[in-house]
From Swiss-Prot:
Oligomer status and interactors: Tetramer of two alpha and two beta subunits.
UniProt entry tagged with the keyword Nucleotide-binding: yes
Identification of the protein by name: Phenylalanine--tRNA ligase alpha subunit
Highest taxon of the lineage: Bacteria
Subcellular location: Cytoplasm
Note on how the cofactor is bound: Binds 2 magnesium ions per tetramer.
Cofactor(s) annotated in UniProt: Mg(2+)
Protein source organism: Pseudomonas aeruginosa (strain UCBPP-PA14)
Binding site for Mg(2+): E252
Length: 338
């Protein structure tokens, strides 16, 4: 047992003088590992008389615990010292000025949508929303566009199957509102729509705002006055507005709406292709068939509808010449609108 006491003293001395955690691990292996000094002493128990083995075994276990406790204590001490040294070296000077954070802002398309909603909210319109995954009936059939109608070729549609699709306009929201609500109805329907098209002025996903008013005694004059007032409020200018005859299956009569070019004030430029006019939206009186399919009597009620692309209006308002810039996530571009 004198050898055991000597081994313990030797191990404790080595632990006390160690200044490195890695060296501490080597000491542990040397004394307590599978081939360590104290482990080898334990293996000599078989050479002792049976009556002495329990007593000697207990002494060896006490010795091993003493060495292990010393190793643990020294390791904790060394790790604490290392942490303190690192904290001292990495101390933060709280008197240094902080780094500024870039502030974000609303996306120009979001700004445009909010502005459109505000313009119509002031004159009594409510905001209505609907599903982006739509069925064929609400996207086409209920809007006077049956399966054989050539107007379907105007919509490059993303289909999931024969009946379900990504909506190509927000007009289905108008249909769903007319199905669930009796006149008078005054709504605007902002939202994402999808068409298989992509170039400088088209995107496969874009934002559209459509409006609907249904009541008694509604005329094209009401539609004309509403649109003229909206466009002047949106652009904050006294713009010239003109209506050109057009065709939409769900309105009759129908019209395209042009405004005096906001870039050249009607003098002619590259943006308006030297015409002095810019097309901004479509409109018309709600077709009687559309009213009937929503169980509204066209003999008693009339309505008008209009639709516009939010990106198109944003391009004109902010002077952007490429629609795709709105979706490139380029902070250099978006930072101009904070």
């Amino acid at each position: 047992m004198e050898n055991l006491d000597a081994l313990v003293s030797q191990a404790l001395e080595a632990v006390r003088h160690t200044e490195d955690v890695n060296a501490l691990e080597q000491i542990r292996v040397h004394y307590l590992g599978k081939k360590g000094e104290l482990t080898q002493v334990m293996k000599t128990l078989g050479d002792l008389p049976a009556e002495e083995r329990p007593k000697v075994g207990a002494l060896i276990n006490v010795a091993k615990e003493k060495v292990q406790d010393a190793l643990n204590a020294r390791k904790t001490e060394l790790e604490g010292a290392a942490l303190a040294a690192r904290l001292a070296a990495e101390r933060i000077d709280v008197t240094l000025p902080g780094r500024g954070q870039l502030s974000g802002g609303l996306h120009p398309v979001t700004r445009t949508l909010e502005r459109i909603e505000q313009c119509f909210s002031r004159i009594g319109y409510e905001v209505a929303e609907g599903p982006e995954v739509e069925d064929d009936y609400h996207n086409f059939e209920a809007l006077n566009i049956p399966g054989h109608h050539p107007a379907r070729a105007m919509h490059d549609t993303f289909y999931f199957n024969a009946n379900m699709l990504l909506r190509t306009h927000t007009s289905p929201v108008q249909v769903r509102t007319m199905e669930s609500q009796q006149p008078p109805i005054r709504i605007v329907c902002p939202g994402r729509v999808y068409r298989c098209d992509s170039d400088l002025t088209h995107s496969p996903m874009f934002h559209q705002v459509e409006g609907l008013l249904v009541d008694e005694g509604v005329s094209f004059a009401d539609l004309k006055g509403t649109i003229e007032e909206f466009l002047r409020a949106f652009f904050e200018k006294q713009l010239e507005v003109r209506f050109r005859p057009s065709f939409f299956p769900f309105t009759e009569p129908s019209a395209e709406v042009d405004i005096q070019c906001v870039i050249c004030s009607g003098n002619g430029c590259r943006v308006c292709k030297q015409t002095g006019w810019l097309e901004v939206m479509g409109c018309g009186m709600v077709h009687p068939n559309v009213l009937r399919m929503s169980n509204i009597d066209p003999e008693k009620f009339q309505g008008f509808a209009f639709g516009m692309g939010a990106e198109r209006l944003a391009m004109l308002r902010y002077g952007v010449n490429d629609l795709r810039l709105f979706f490139d996530n380029d902070l250099r571009f978006l930072g101009q609108f904070r």
